[in-house]
């Protein structure tokens, strides 16, 4: 592929509208400074002091992040999160991204937001080292009423997108 052909293709990304249907989660990174390690008075176990916390959309949100990086014009996540602090944080991070429309991203009190907490040992001039991950998941099936809302939402989005350039990723 020539550079001109590549630019010709990628220059059209801004005109696309893409829906992403899938499991969105919150990836939360806890950056730990090993120089600040202490010992717990109560338990005698090591205490890993977190010096920075950052979060970003994960799961299907990783695909969304990639589309944002490619400067796709409009991106519509079709999914849900819990009505909890992690859901608030996930929605906030999605809303910060250019071109992301949250009209079809449902908040539900019946579910908790999938959250993957990733402790990282961070030292100067070294790659971060990930410790054991801490996951918060739903261990029961998605309630049928909530599951039924998502296909209806995606169908409404497809009908309202008639005649527009773009694809629905399912």
Language-model region placement:
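Ribokinase/PfkB-type carbohydrate-kinase core domain
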Residues: 1-38, 42, 49-170
